[in-house]
């Protein structure tokens, strides 16, 4: 599961617009919002592109965004 809030924090911190992020990830804005809503998952190549777009993001934050275990546990409760 993806942590939408952390994803958005990174985007805002670096002053990016969602349309810029979606284009950089190679998808439409609607597809990005679907992935952030956990309708579908980010692929490995999309996650890699995110890391390329935001190289300053720590590995820990990257893991928290794309492998949000706490959200997965809450969703199953």
Tell me what each language-model feature is.
Residues 45-61:
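DNA major-groove recognition helix of helix-turn-helix/homeodomain DNA-binding modules
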Residues 1, 40-45:
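Short acidic alpha-helix initiation/capping motifs at coil-to-helix transition points
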Residues 27-42:
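Recognition helix of helix-turn-helix/homeodomain-like DNA-binding domains
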Residues 15, 60-77:
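Short, charged recognition helix plus adjacent turn
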Residues 9, 34, 52, 64:
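DNA-binding alpha-helical recognition surfaces that contact promoter or target DNA
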Residues 1-20, 24:
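A short, Lys/Arg-rich alpha-helix, primarily the initiator
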């Amino acid at each position: 599961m993806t942590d939408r809030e952390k994803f958005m924090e990174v985007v805002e911190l670096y002053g990016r617009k969602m349309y810029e992020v979606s284009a950089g990830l190679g998808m439409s804005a609607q597809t990005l919002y679907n992935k952030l809503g956990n309708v579908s998952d980010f692929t490995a190549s999309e996650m890699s592109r995110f890391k390329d777009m935001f190289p300053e993001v720590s590995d820990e934050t990257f893991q928290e965004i794309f492998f949000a275990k706490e959200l997965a546990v809450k969703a199953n409760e």
